[in-house]
Amino acid sequence: MQKRTFALLTLTVLFGLELSGREPIKSLPPVKQRAETKIVRARDLGVPFDGTPGKLNSITDVPGVEVGYTTLISGEGKLDVGKGPVRTGVTAIIPRGHDSLNDPVYAGYFSLNGNGEMTGTAWVDESGFLEGPIVITNTHSVGVARDAVIAWRIKHGAPDTTGYWWSLPVVAETWDGWLNDINGFHVKPEDVFHALDTAHGGVIEEGSVGGGTGMICYEFKGGNGTASRQINIRTSKDTPPRTFVVGVFLQANFGRRSQLVIAGVPVGKDIPGEVYKEESGSCIAVVATDAPLLPNQLKRLAKRVSLGLARTGTVSGNGSGDLFIAFSTANPNVANPDRVTHTIQTIPNDLMDPLFTGVVQATEEAVVNALVDNHSMTGRDNHYVEALPHDRLHELIKHSHSMR
């Protein structure tokens, strides 16, 4: 992450529940920095992947899951701390949508390498529940994002009739300081509110949007990527299978160029380039499923993100914050304290291998989508990060697979 060398600053951020007058900046990068082309994902370039994706090949294939962004892009040239250039944002993921904010989901958390932050996970580990949205931003905006989530939930959640309601939000980060004025604290509470308020199902953007705006992956322009897999589980040949979906969303900000492998092809070695002198970066991953799983089983799903990342070449370096959380939208209302007991459904451990496989496959594809559905970007001090060239990737994949 290269973030531990900065001096620590203490901020007191005061805000009410209403939005301030500043409108979130939702502009795309200047036209000169991007090509005006249609959305292109990895499969559009002929990249082969294992498994059967959901309809949208997205985390939003899991019914109820909603994703929202605030993208902050402004300024050019030399860094002026507090003014810019700004290349950052906020991502919000709501497990069962806006209509179920008061219904926690079973969840599990895993840290592959802990040079990072995902708040609230001590309580996820202890309770087995995720109680609200997941927000992802840059390293130095975790505090303001966490406070904003609490304020937003006070406004939009169930009335607090006791006066003792509390919240431990899940807010995660990766470092975008190569392109962004990260010490300028440009993410404000209203930016978090906007991402939460505008979260939706269906098709979502990838690449340099939301929290992924200023991120770098394998020394190409990185950011957000998503993918999904349909999973058929059956107990015997004589019973019809039940179909579930696993979806992965990640904020990709990791890896050296030479490590990059796509569909088994060492792409990074054939497209040389360098942004950093040493391994630097992180990955935040969110796994969603409608399969009925218990918290310990969801932790096992979260662990499998590691294998999907490894298929793209990363070794999860010392400076990497690789933090993963998984949740299930099944078993609604099981956290309701109005009943002494609840009846729940769960899949036996012996039948979980297809789910593990789906997470690995979707994670691998989500990383490549983050690289492909993207554009080159210039940020602070004219730092430039190129996007993965589509024509070259297509050529390398086609040549490699024609030789097999």
Show where each model-derived region lies:
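Bacterial N-terminal signal peptides that target proteins for export
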Residues: 1-7
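Bacterial N-terminal signal peptides
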Residues: 7-18
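Alpha/propeptide regions of enzymes that mature by internal proteolysis
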Residues: 22-404
